[in-house]
Design a protein with these regions (language model features):
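Compositionally biased intrinsically disordered regions enriched in Thr/Gly
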Residues: 1-182
Length: 182
């Protein structure tokens, strides 16, 4: 798959840069002179698979020092017949305006249920940012939309997320869940 190959090459290039940096630090400070500890990790969790489509959340964590590292989620959905990565317009037929309205409604319910966890303007941010390029991935229960830490709330609140049932959308693709078509 072209996308995964490009990502793998980026990761290799990044890690080679880390090795080069560490070698420079060892040369400059000696093996005992480096006190900086950092690490990164990547985990991919399959959230949906039906033989035709696969969707997963790639969860990354990068710690470079300080109080905590930074997590990152990357939602990825592929058509296994074509090998192509799918975007929201490949999955749903709704307009961008309809998408924004549906997702904002679900986030409004979530935010209003826990208002103390969110920035005062969290719902405005959702309304302003939901579009065809929004972060998403497929699950058995629907399309999951999410924001990264600090986007709508504090780091401690994690990733604000909602899963919206497929029947809320005009689906372009036919998904299978066990024996039943979604």
């Amino acid at each position: 798959n072209r996308y995964l190959e490009e990502e793998q090459n980026k990761n290799i290039e990044y890690e080679n840069g880390n090795v080069e940096w560490m070698e420079e630090m060892i040369e400059e400070y000696g093996e005992d002179g480096i006190s900086h500890s950092s690490y990164s990790s990547t985990l991919s969790e399959i959230a949906y698979f039906d033989g035709r489509y696969v969707s997963f959340c790639q969860q990354e964590y990068d710690y470079q020092g300080g109080a905590h590292g930074m997590p990152l989620w990357i939602g990825l959905t592929f058509d296994l017949e074509t090998g192509e990565r799918l975007s929201l317009p490949d999955v749903i037929a709704n307009s961008e305006e309809e998408l924004n309205s549906i997702v904002t409604e679900y986030f409004a319910e979530y935010i209003n249920g826990n208002p103390e966890e969110f920035w005062e303007d969290a719902l405005d941010i959702v309304r302003d940012e939901i579009c065809f390029e929004s972060d998403f991935y497929l699950t058995e229960d629907g399309i999951k939309f999410y924001f990264h830490p600090y986007a709508l709330s504090s780091y401690a609140a994690g990733f604000p997320e909602v899963t919206i049932p497929y029947d809320e959308f005009e689906m372009k693709i036919s998904l299978q869940s066990g024996e039943q078509e979604l």
